[in-house]
Regions:
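N-terminal positively charged helical leader segments and presequences
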Residues: 1-108
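Short, glycine/polar-rich helix-capping loops at beta-to-alpha or helix-loop-helix junctions
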Residues: 55, 152-158, 220-229
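Surface-exposed amphipathic alpha-helices with a cationic face
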Residues: 64, 182-186, 262
């Protein structure tokens, strides 16, 4: 089942001068591996300097898949943070937020007497981009954002900071499968659009009813599977041609599309 989020302010600076043991700090190879696999949310993975390259590569790859930041630290710092010499060169900070369910997001829209307006991340990896998307989503009236448990950024302190305060007010649901979530939303009458370069020009779409906007990853965009599940595809036309600059940054594209949705929903 999906989880609910009501964000809390970050508790600590992971680079602080006086690191201390914390209940949210998990250490040891097996515990950290299981935490990363669980999809329960990881802010940062700390790897000891001097760790075997193959082991470091393993945890770096897992951290990227889980949307976590990787930092290399001196073994003594890990000892201070964990309170033990048996940290095995790896530790991780669990996410500091509580997630909501997709049903909670829909209920929030109903409570306001508004048709649902959701944003879905299909693999946005950069925490700064995710934070910027959250900021635009809040300002444009979205009732929440949905992110994947794996294969994209989770809501870390970097995301919270990049959202410029939006993360304190915008509910976030984290789901195991974006495709299945789209199917469930469609069953409940939500019209699902994705943003892609081969879509219909943005302003030619009716964006006034129950709606969800899917945004793809920075590198490959919306996956083909997700795209096939969507009811419609929108695109942003660009004036510059033949320059080699052929797309908007995902957070910029999100801001433009979300503002158009807000305008149409307001009857403008």
């Amino acid at each position: 089942m999906d989880e609910q989020k009501m964000p809390r302010r970050p508790r600590r600076d992971h680079d602080g001068e006086q690191p201390q043991k914390s209940e949210s700090l998990v250490y040891g190879k097996n515990p950290v591996t299981e935490l990363l696999k669980s999809g329960s949310g990881v802010d940062t993975v700390l790897l000891a300097e001097g760790m075997a390259p193959a082991v470091a590569a393993y945890f770096t790859a897992m951290a990227k898949e889980a949307g976590a930041t990787v930092k290399r630290v001196h073994p003594n710092k890990l000892r201070l943070m964990t309170g033990t010499e048996s940290h095995q060169g790896v530790a991780a900070f669990a996410s500091e937020i509580e997630y909501a369910s997709v049903e909670d997001l829909l209920a929030a829209a109903k409570a306001k007497g508004e048709p649902p307006f959701l944003v879905l991340s299909d693999g946005i990896e950069d925490p700064h981009n995710l934070g910027a998307v959250m900021r635009s989503a809040l300002l444009c009236g979205a009732h929440g954002i949905v992110i994947p448990k794996r294969g994209g950024a989770s809501v870390t302190p970097t995301v919270i900071k990049s959202s410029a305060g939006a993360a304190e007010h915008l509910p976030v649901a984290r789901v195991a499968n974006i495709g299945e979530t789209i199917r469930r939303l469609k069953e409940q009458g939500v019209f699902v659009y994705c943003a892609d370069m081969d879509g219909v020009p943005l302003r030619k779409n009716n964006l006034t009813g129950p709606i969800a906007l899917v945004l793809g990853s920075e590198g490959s965009g919306v996956s083909q599977l997700v795209k096939k599940l969507c009811d419609g595809v929108v695109r942003l036309d660009m004036a510059a041609q033949g320059t080699g600059v052929d797309s908007f940054n995902v957070s910029v594209a999100a801001g433009i599309i979300l503002y158009e949705i807000q305008s149409q929903r307001a009857g403008e």
